[in-house]
UniProtKB/Swiss-Prot annotation:
Subunit structure: Part of the 30S ribosomal subunit. Contacts proteins S5 and S12.
SUPFAM superfamilies: Ribosomal protein S8
Gene name of this polypeptide: rpsH
Disulfide bond sites: none
Record keywords, A-Z: Ribonucleoprotein, Ribosomal protein, RNA-binding, rRNA-binding
One of the protein's GO biological processes: translation
UniProt-recorded Gene Ontology molecular function terms: rRNA binding; structural constituent of ribosome
Function: One of the primary rRNA binding proteins, it binds directly to 16S rRNA central domain where it helps coordinate assembly of the platform of the 30S subunit.
Family classification: Belongs to the universal ribosomal protein uS8 family.
Pfam families, per database record: Ribosomal_S8 (PF00410)
NCBIfam families: PRK00136.1
Stated name of the protein: Small ribosomal subunit protein uS8
Length: 132
């Protein structure tokens, strides 16, 4: 079975695992998913991640972060740009998530960036997801 939106699958696995209070979740790996996990780690939404090699595409293991071991740090993680409805923004149109409390993650010409970094760099791109 082919997957039409692997990024949405990754975000859904992270959302479900955090709601179920799991410490880690395994996701089929790709370069884009590793870049996305890198941004989530830098912003403090996940503890860590590692890529485990197998004979296929590899597995991305994401270690989730919780507040007092009970409440997940990720309250909401939502896909914005979808395969059937892409959302592109210019550097002056980058959305603010929850009045700056959350993060929008963009795919730009300079790589996967947060909304703040993209504004500072003056680049726009495709809005992958929002996290808060």
């Amino acid at each position: 079975m082919s997957m039409t939106d692997p990024i949405a699958d990754m975000l859904t696995r992270i959302r479900n695992a955090s709601m179920a209070k799991l410490q880690k979740v395994d996701i089929p790996s790709s370069n884009l998913k590793v870049s996305l996990a890198n941004v989530l780690k830098a912003e403090g939404f996940i503890k860590n991640f590692k890529v485990i090699a197998d004979n296929k595409q590899g597995v991305l293991r994401v270690y989730l972060r919780f507040i007092d071991e009970k409440e997940p740090v990720i309250r909401e993680i939502k896909r914005v740009s979808k395969p059937g409805s892409r959302v592109y923004v210019g550097s002056d149109e980058i959305p603010s998530v929850k009045s700056g409390m959350g993060v929008a993650i963009l795919s730009t010409s300079k790589g996967i960036l947060t909304d703040k970094v993209a504004r500072e760099a003056g680049v726009g791109g495709e809005v992958i997801c929002t996290v808060w």
